[in-house]
Amino acid sequence: MDREDINPMLSRLDVENNNTFSSFVDKTLMMMPPSTFSGEVEPSSSSSWYPESFHVHAPPLPPENDQIGEKGKELKEKRSRKVPRIAFHTRSDDDVLDDGYRWRKYGQKSVKHNAHPRSYYRCTYHTCNVKKQVQRLAKDPNVVVTTYEGVHNHPCEKLMETLNPLLRQLQFLSSFSNL
């Protein structure tokens, strides 16, 4: 499959950088061919917000057949390890939705053809490299697009806060059963 066959709406630079969520957020997500979707995200009834979209996975680029030195090969291997990206469309009045993790805002920029800026966040857990981008759609400002890049390597902090009292109770009760 040629790079240009992946999606005609993306420029070659966007495809090479796996930047499917550049300034074309609304257009690209709405016009991507079905082959780039790897599955459905089912909303949970226990969730406080319901995603209205899908899991997007950009296919890896084909290897190039040029002669590269050792450092070039290492860089190419590092670039070929793609971090998973997941995008959710959510109808909400709030810009930042509570997903159970703690985030630190590290940037914001205005985007062409959109009155709403894009905000950039990092997970605050010390060993976690997950990032997220939050932006409203230009065509429908009631929809927030949240794009996650990476996978958390720790439990959800809010879930643990909720479960800690229950776990303490279980430990307390199990200490009686051991007597």
Swiss-Prot record:
User: Known Pfam families for this protein?
Assistant: WRKY
Q: What is this protein called in UniProt? A: Probable WRKY transcription factor 24
Is-annotated flag, keyword Nucleus?
Answer: yes
Role noted for this protein? Transcription factor. Interacts specifically with the W box (5'-(T)TGAC[CT]-3'), a frequently occurring elicitor-responsive cis-acting element.
Q: Which InterPro entries match?
A: WRKY_dom (IPR003657), WRKY_dom_sf (IPR036576), WRKY_plant (IPR044810)
Question: Which cysteine-cysteine pairs are annotated as disulfide bonds in the entry?
Answer: none
GO molecular function list: DNA-binding transcription factor activity; sequence-specific DNA binding
Can you say where in the cell this protein is located? Nucleus
Task: Summarize which parts of the chain are annotated to bind DNA, as ranges.
Answer: 92-157
Matching entries from SMART domains are given as: WRKY
Q: Which family does it belong to?
A: Belongs to the WRKY group II-c family.
The principal location of this protein is: nucleus
Task: Please provide the record's keywords in A-Z order.
Answer: DNA-binding, Nucleus, Transcription, Transcription regulation
**GO cellular component annotations, sorted alphabetically?**
nucleus
